[in-house]
From Swiss-Prot:
It is found in: Golgi apparatus; Endoplasmic reticulum. The keyword Endoplasmic reticulum applies. This is Zinc-type alcohol dehydrogenase-like protein C16A3.02c. Pfam families: ADH_N, ADH_zinc_N_2. PANTHER family: ALCOHOL DEHYDROGENASE RELATED (PTHR11695), RETICULON-4-INTERACTING PROTEIN 1, MITOCHONDRIAL (PTHR11695:SF294). One of its GO terms (molecular function) is oxidoreductase activity, acting on the CH-OH group of donors, NAD or NADP as acceptor. One of its GO terms (cellular component) is mitochondrion. Its main location: Golgi. Its EC number is 1.-.-.-. Keywords: Endoplasmic reticulum, Golgi apparatus, Oxidoreductase. It comes from Schizosaccharomyces pombe (strain 972 / ATCC 24843) (Fission yeast). InterPro entries: ADH-like_N, GroES-like_sf, NAD(P)-bd_dom_sf, PKS_ER, YIM1/Zinc_Alcohol_DH_Fams. It comes from the Eukaryota. Belongs to the zinc-containing alcohol dehydrogenase family. Quinone oxidoreductase subfamily.
Amino acid sequence: MSSETKSEFGTKSAWLYNRTGKPKDVLYLEKGLHIPNPAELGPYDVLVEVVATSINPLDYKLMNTYQMIAKALFKLPNIPGYDFAGRVLAVGSEVKEFSATQRVWGCQSFPRAGRQGGSCATHIVTGDKDVWHLPDGVSFNEGAGFGIAGLTAWEVLVRQMKVKPGTKLVIEGASGGVGTFAVALAKALECEVTTISSTENLDLCKSLGATHTLDYKKDNLVERLADLGPYDFVFDCVNDNVLYRASSKFVKPDGAFFGIGGDITLSYVGSRLSRTLRPRVLGGSSHSYYNILLHVDQEMLRDFVDFVMKHNIKTVIDSVYDFEDTVEAFNRLMTHRCKGKVIIKTD
């Protein structure tokens, strides 16, 4: 590193991958990376010292997708991760909302993560519309967990479903990162919530506000949902085609499915297109199926955190790992047994 580019903030460390594969096979830690000086920031950039990050299934699915897809989506080597919480170090010349030392949380935009890298690092340069203030009393670990999981739940329930008091809702995969936020948000929005999870997670779902808790290991889900329904919406967090095909038995005629999850493969894309486009006479369902692609904006960040503070909604944290143990954090996430969020602390 030349003296002309030496940063006043020192250097950063980051986890990177330069080929596709499982995290344990492709992730490596690199130290001594350059941190931009204030003069090097774009006008709307915010430089954040990351205190905690959380990881999501999207992170390892992108890492483990086809090489040709990876090259089309992002620049290699790439830093994985989208969610973060930390302290502002410097801002661009046009940034008015933030200043140095402020506590913030955010979600790196997909295009920026592809070009410049994500949040599995000690420092991140993000856009001023992709970050918001972290309220007093909220820990960095909790704030890091808001990100994709909390905002996806908010997008589906508030912006897409537009739920209101009395809305009847099924949440499948209710004990994961998105699911736990969805249950808590739906409860605060006065919905009637039926959750689907494993036996060991029934109590967690109940504690978050579920009206009814179903066990996918023991219950006949279609029969139980038919008894408890009909429902306005189903929020599918696990990519379950079986429930969708049986939806006429428990979803109202004008109801709909909203889905996330699934691998980034051609077969997955085909199954999603089938659910979205295939008519009932060809084996599909009469209900609409909406695939959720999250687009974060500052209004969403602000509204979400205001709501969770008002209703005392907490991030459910499954586990916390040191930065050096990031590969182990991914291994935990990939068990599909997490109760809430997996957090990585960087300090």
